């Protein structure tokens, strides 16, 4: 083997498998049982607001999903708010319905541990609305997931937002702001777009996804300063110092949500290591998301 050869990049799936195996070697304790979504007095569950289940067209999806749960166990994550995306986008109505059906099955398999986002493509307006209502009302999904099929300020998105408002569930919206176009994502929304959408629908519960996902996190945080209806998902693989503290200073702790987007150790370490007091960390790690989820009557 040539020692100068560049190693193959490690995929997130390989990392999750390795992390789960390493954690198992280091601790013989069994996975912790799931706690009720209503916390015991003085306790707040740790809720990952941004996670993904694996599409069933992938070999080994069962092992990948199990690895996600096992890593969450080892890192002290009590709840995973999960969506599943179609392998090809824009998603067809049949495609997103299939994904949501599999998410519902995972919710049943991991009773109370996996919370579902209903993924839809607003480009199929009636099918999207019907699917959101079916998922939330019949299967207990906790929110809506929108990806990059349409910029969030496109009028085709508005009926989806109105449905989420009516059902009193949040929308986790894929977002990013770079200083060059995102390849393959011409319709990606950014923090400014979500702020504009929030001005149109101030009652909407919007979540700007993965501020640490590789774009300009400082720009995104500043863009959301005057959009109190938008929460910030702190997930992503970028581990720059000071992101959490900067967001807490400009937006306030109550608007920040813990998330991993599959970068599990980075997501947990970012909050655990932040220069904030324990009360602020508890809000970010679960209290703020718990408050959002509590807005829909049970």
Regions found by a protein language model. Name each.
Residues 2-49, 62, 66-79, 133, ...:
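Mid-to-C-terminal alpha-helical segments outside catalytic/metal-binding sites
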Residues 46-56, 172-176, 208:
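Histidine-centered catalytic micro-motifs
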Residues 50, 72, 103, 116, ...:
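Divalent metal-coordination and catalytic microenvironments
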Residues 52-63, 89-90, 181:
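Acidic/histidine-rich helix-loop elements
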Residues 52-54, 85-87, 119-123, 147-149, ...:
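Active-site beta-loop-alpha junctions enriched in small/polar residues
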Residues 139-143, 150, 154-257:
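Catalytic pocket-lining loop regions of alpha/beta-barrel enzymes
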């Amino acid at each position: 083997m040539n020692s100068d050869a560049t190693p193959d990049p490690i995929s997130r799936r390989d990392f999750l498998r390795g992390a789960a195996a390493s954690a198992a070697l280091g601790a013989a304790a069994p996975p912790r049982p799931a706690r009720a979504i209503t916390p015991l007095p003085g306790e707040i569950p740790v809720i990952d607001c941004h996670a993904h289940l694996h599409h069933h067209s992938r070999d080994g999806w069962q092992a990948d999903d199990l690895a996600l749960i096992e890593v969450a166990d080892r890192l002290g994550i009590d709840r995973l708010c999960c969506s599943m995306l179609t392998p090809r986008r824009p998603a067809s109505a049949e495609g997103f319905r299939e994904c949501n059906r599999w998410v519902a099955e995972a919710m049943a398999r991991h009773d109370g541990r996996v919370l579902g986002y209903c993924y839809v493509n607003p480009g199929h307006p009636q099918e999207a609305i019907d699917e959101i209502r079916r998922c939330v009302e019949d299967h207990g999904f906790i929110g809506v997931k929108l990806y990059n099929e349409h910029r969030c300020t496109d009028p085709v998105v508005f009926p989806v937002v109105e449905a989420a408002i009516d059902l009193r569930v949040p929308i986790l919206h894929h977002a990013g702001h770079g200083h060059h176009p995102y390849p393959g994502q011409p319709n990606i929304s950014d923090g400014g777009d979500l702020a504009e959408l929030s001005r149109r629908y101030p009652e909407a519960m919007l979540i700007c996804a993965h501020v640490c996902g590789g774009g300009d996190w400082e720009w995104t945080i500043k863009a959301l300063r005057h959009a109190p209806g938008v929460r910030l998902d702190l997930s992503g693989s970028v581990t720059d110092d000071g992101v959490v503290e900067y967001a807490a200073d400009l937006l306030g702790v109550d608007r920040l949500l813990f998330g991993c987007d599959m970068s599990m150790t980075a997501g947990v370490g970012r909050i655990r290591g932040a220069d904030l007091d324990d009360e602020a960390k508890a809000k970010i790690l679960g209290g703020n998301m718990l408050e959002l989820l509590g807005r829909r009557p049970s």
